[in-house]
Regions:
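Conserved SAM-binding loop
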Residues: 85
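Conserved beta-strand signature within the Rossmann-like core of class I S-adenosyl-L-methionine
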Residues: 139-150
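S-adenosyl-L-methionine
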Residues: 1-45
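A short, conserved alpha-helix within the catalytic core of class I
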Residues: 122-134
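Conserved SAM-binding strand-loop segment of SAM-dependent methyltransferases
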Residues: 92-103
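Conserved SAM-binding loop of SAM-dependent methyltransferases across substrates and taxa
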Residues: 57-69
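Conserved class I S-adenosyl-L-methionine
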Residues: 46-56
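Conserved SAM-binding motif I beta-strand of class I
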Residues: 71-76
């Protein structure tokens, strides 16, 4: 029995360590900061769809629904966190989708209006560029909320605590 528990703990620790190699480590976001970002930085409009890049335990998705998002979509590579997210959001059936996969190779849903990301300083510019590609393809502006890091080389339009808002407009002259 003890060996089984130790084995499960070791597997869980390994999953968290391995997923941290491919992206940002899991750091829970404070609910109060998320609430503040969604009320002061970028309040939701009626048909807003939020995509969370590296959705972790689903707290951002949950708070986005509470704040008025019509739909939320999360991408997470840690299967344990995907399960926790699904459990957290189970009362919101039909308003959330969580994918167990990397977001780097996905095409954004056509109706995405807000992208939320906590990325390490080495990745946040690449995430911004990914959202710029999505904006170019859709021909629509997408608001990008970065938690914890500013995007180097770009000016944010607003800041609330550790959240930075960027309004990404399509660049029609670029090929995507």
């Amino acid at each position: 029995m003890v060996e089984s528990v130790i084995g499960i703990v070791v597997i869980c620790v390994l999953i968290f360590l391995l997923t941290a190699l491919f992206g940002a480590p899991y750091v829970p976001t404070q609910r109060k900061q998320i609430e503040s970002a969604f009320s002061k930085l970028r309040p939701f409009k009626k048909n807003d769809v939020l995509v969370d890049l590296g959705s972790g335990d689903g707290v951002v998705l949950y708070e986005a629904i509470r704040a008025g998002a019509s739909k939320v979509i999360g991408y997470e590579i840690n299967p344990i966190l995907v399960l926790i997210s699904c459990l957290r959001l189970r009362s919101n059936r039909g308003r959330f989708t969580i994918f167990w996969r990397s977001f780097w190779r996905i095409n954004a849903p056509s109706d995405v209006s807000i992208v939320y990301a906590f990325g390490e300083s080495r990745d946040i510019k690449k995430m911004y560029d990914l959202v710029q590609k999505w904006s170019n393809r859709s021909g629509r502006e997408i608001d990008f909320i970065s938690y914890g890091f500013e995007v180097p080389g770009f000016n944010h339009s607003k800041k609330e605590n550790a959240h930075f808002l960027y309004n990404i407009a399509p660049l029609h002259s670029q090929k995507t």
